Amino acid sequence: MVALLAVVGIGVAVFVGFNIGGSSTGVAFGPAVGSRLIRKTTAGALFVAFGFLGAWTVGREVITTMSSSIVPAAQFTPLASVAVLFFTGASLLVSNLYGVPASTSMTAVGAIVGLGLASGTLNQALMFVIVSAWIVAPL
C-alpha cells in the first residue's frame, strides 16, 4: 500500500508541477512573450532555472511554514500529503483551464487549511498573519 501511495504521490506532484508551470509562467513571462521580447521556450527555461534557484535559496522558510506551522507536521501523513497536493493541483488546473491567474501559494495554503480544519489542528493565529499579509501585500 505504501509503494502504491508513493507512486500516486509522485504522479500527483508531477500534476501539481505541470499546473504551477501553467499558472505561474504565464503570470511571470506573459508580457515579455506577448511583446515578443522572448520566446515561449526561453520563458520556460528561465522559469525552471529561477524557480529552482528561488526554491533552493529563499524558499526554505516558506517550506518550514507550509510543512509544520500552519498545521502540525504530524498531520502530514502520506495520504494527507497526497490529498493536499491533489487539491492544490486540481484548483490550479481549474483556474488554468479558465485562464484565470491564481496564486500557487494561496492555493497550497488553502489546501493545507482544509487539512487543518478537517483535523481540528489549524494554527488560527498564524493564518490571521498570513491572510493579513495577503491583504496588505498588493498595497
Model-derived regions, located:
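Short, non-helical or kinked segments that cap or interrupt transmembrane helices
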Residues: G21-F29, L37, Y98-G110
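Hydrophobic alpha-helical transmembrane segments
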Residues: G21-G30, Q75-F86
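Interfacial segments of multi-pass membrane proteins
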Residues: P31-I38, G110-L122
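Membrane-interface alpha-helices at helix entry/exit sites of multi-pass transporters
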Residues: L37-V48, P78-V82, Q124-V129
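Structural signal for the N-terminal portions of transmembrane helices
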Residues: L122-L139
